[in-house]
């Protein structure tokens, strides 16, 4: 084991090496495996055909989330309602069969703890600092917010982890993204990560494991950190780590699957030792000034297409790279925008508050604080609030947030991935715009022809009540309990 100063990433990597290989890769032990209905059926079937057991069912957790409807799931007598889409129904049925057959804990669609895997993992204490965690889903990097080395894998790798609890991997380069200073009170973690992605570009993190550091990162709550780490993949990075600290330990203490008693004390001591050593050298360091971050919105079809809400649509000719110019022209055509057009005031027909990026209780509180005493604008046809899990939903209802949203004209839904992606009934109609708290604004991501503008929960709420993309700083402040 090297005694040279090491980064957080290097410490976790080194602790999980089973075997070093001549080509520089290594066989890495995987501590945790999250499974959902979309990328697991083929892997389970391959195990079944080969007569292999799942190596560590106790380190595996299965949760349906992508295809589940967010409307009622059972009828008045408690019977499951049928899933309309045949492919979705098949995938959900497969997970319901496969997980119990292979001894995996299965949180069903009707379980009060069901939700999006990247919300359920942390809140259950399944995600822990210093662990390696994988899922057949690109936004697995979210768990890095708790100091885990977490990343998405493909279906063939899902099978490999199920069978061996290992993966052959090549070590990533390390990148420090240091956010210096304090964020403005009107700036959210979503604004911060959109700003970072714009600064790095969607390929800027390719080949790197990002570690987020600096005063602004330390000041974030755990749920805000989860938002930042979640979108590391949109910057091209394999994962996005934040060193565990006292906030992390307080968040995890007492969680159902977190260590207990003496095991907890032992775990915390080890977690503390994982912080990047003084003198450790990153392959690259990027410095972000917190004061430069403003409430932001995407204008195009790439997560790097970000401007402040006070900004305008850029002219494709302003990009130096011809490929970027061409991409910008295609984006503007798809999005129905013109160079120089102001983002503020752009009408939206749909608003989505949810996804593994922004569906936790703090996100819903932020949105509700904007919605309170106001009503969804007449031109907004669809305004959904989709909690990230059953636990989040019940907490929000205990705080009365559901009533705030419903009184304002929002639909209050059951947990799931929902309108983040067009794999369930929640979609944006072709040609319509959506102010969305999700993580991707790709062509067709929210439905064929859908036009997505990525924003924070507070910005999405502001768009809903005004009917257009709005600088929330211009809204008359209203305290919960008062009238607008």
From Swiss-Prot:
Its EC number is 4.2.1.33. It catalyses: (2R,3S)-3-isopropylmalate = (2S)-2-isopropylmalate. [4Fe-4S] cluster binds at residues 356, 417, 420. Keywords: 4Fe-4S, Amino-acid biosynthesis, Branched-chain amino acid biosynthesis, Iron, Iron-sulfur, Leucine biosynthesis, Lyase, Metal-binding. Binds 1 [4Fe-4S] cluster per subunit. Pfam families: Aconitase (PF00330). InterPro entries: 3-IsopropMal_deHydase_lsu (IPR004430), Acnase/IPM_dHydase_lsu_aba_1/3 (IPR015931), Acoase/IPM_deHydtase_lsu_aba (IPR001030), Aconitase_4Fe-4S_BS (IPR018136), Aconitase_4Fe-4S_dom (IPR036008), IPM_dehydratase_rel_enz (IPR050067), IPMI_cat (IPR033941). The keyword Transmembrane does not apply. Its cofactor is [4Fe-4S] cluster. Heterodimer of LeuC and LeuD. It comes from the Bacteria. Belongs to the aconitase/IPM isomerase family. LeuC type 1 subfamily. It comes from Zymomonas mobilis subsp. mobilis (strain ATCC 31821 / ZM4 / CP4). The keyword Transferase does not apply. Disulfide bonds: none annotated. It is an enzyme of class 4 (lyase). Pathway: Amino-acid biosynthesis; L-leucine biosynthesis; L-leucine from 3-methyl-2-oxobutanoate: step 2/4. One of its GO terms (molecular function) is 4 iron, 4 sulfur cluster binding. Catalyzes the isomerization between 2-isopropylmalate and 3-isopropylmalate, via the formation of 2-isopropylmaleate. This is 3-isopropylmalate dehydratase large subunit. GO terms for biological process: L-leucine biosynthetic process.
């Amino acid at each position: 084991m090297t005694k040279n100063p090491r980064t957080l990433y290097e410490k976790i990597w080194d602790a999980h090496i089973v075997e070093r290989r001549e080509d520089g890769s290594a066989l890495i032990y995987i501590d945790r495996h999250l499974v959902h209905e979309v990328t697991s059926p083929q892997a389970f079937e391959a195990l079944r055909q080969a007569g292999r057991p799942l190596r560590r069912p106790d380190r595996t957790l299965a949760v349906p989330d992508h295809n589940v409807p967010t409307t009622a799931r059972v009828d008045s007598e408690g019977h499951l309602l049928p899933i309309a889409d045949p492919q979705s129904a098949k995938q959900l049925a497969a997970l319901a069969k496969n997980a119990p057959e292979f001894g995996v804990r299965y949180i069903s669609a009707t379980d009060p703890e069901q939700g999006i895997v990247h919300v359920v993992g942390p809140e259950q204490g399944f995600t822990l600092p210093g662990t390696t965690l994988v899922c057949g889903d690109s936004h697995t990097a979210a768990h890095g917010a708790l100091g885990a080395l977490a990343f998405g894998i493909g279906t063939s790798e899902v099978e490999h982890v199920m069978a061996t609890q290992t993966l052959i991997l090549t070590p990533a380069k390390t990148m420090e993204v240091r956010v210096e200073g304090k964020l403005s009170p009107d700036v959210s973690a979503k604004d911060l990560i959109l700003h970072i992605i714009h600064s790095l570009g969607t390929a800027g993190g390719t080949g790197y494991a990002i570690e987020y550091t600096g005063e602004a990162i330390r000041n974030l709550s755990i749920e805000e950190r989860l938002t930042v780490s979640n979108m590391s993949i949109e910057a091209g990075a394999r994962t996005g780590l934040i060193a565990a600290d006292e906030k992390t330990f307080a968040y995890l203490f007492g969680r159902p699957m977190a260590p207990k008693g003496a095991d907890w004390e032992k775990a915390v001591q080890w977690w503390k030792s994982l912080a990047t050593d003084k003198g450790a050298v990153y392959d690259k360091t990027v410095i972000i000034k917190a004061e430069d971050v403003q409430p932001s919105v995407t204008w195009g079809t790439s997560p790097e297409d970000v401007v402040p809400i006070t900004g305008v649509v850029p002219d494709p000719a302003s990009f130096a790279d011809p490929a970027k110019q061409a991409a910008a022209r295609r984006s503007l055509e798809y999005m129905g925008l013109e160079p120089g057009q102001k983002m503020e005031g752009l009408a939206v027909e749909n608003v989505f508050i949810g996804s593994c990026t922004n569906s936790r209780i703090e996100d819903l509180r932020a949105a509700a604080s904007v919605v309170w005493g106001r009503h969804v604008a007449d031109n907004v046809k669809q305004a959904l609030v989709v909690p990230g899990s059953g636990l989040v939903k019940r907490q929000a209802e205990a705080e009365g947030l559901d009533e705030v949203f419903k009184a304002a004209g929002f639909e209050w839904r059951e947990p799931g991935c929902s309108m983040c992606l067009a794999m369930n009934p929640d979609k944006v109609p072709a040609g319509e715009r959506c102010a969305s708290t999700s993580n991707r604004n790709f062509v067709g991501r929210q439905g064929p022809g859908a036009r997505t503008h990525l924003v924070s929960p507070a910005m999405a709420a502001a768009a809903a009540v005004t009917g257009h993309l709005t600088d929330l700083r211009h809204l008359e402040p209203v305290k919960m309990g008062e009238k607008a």
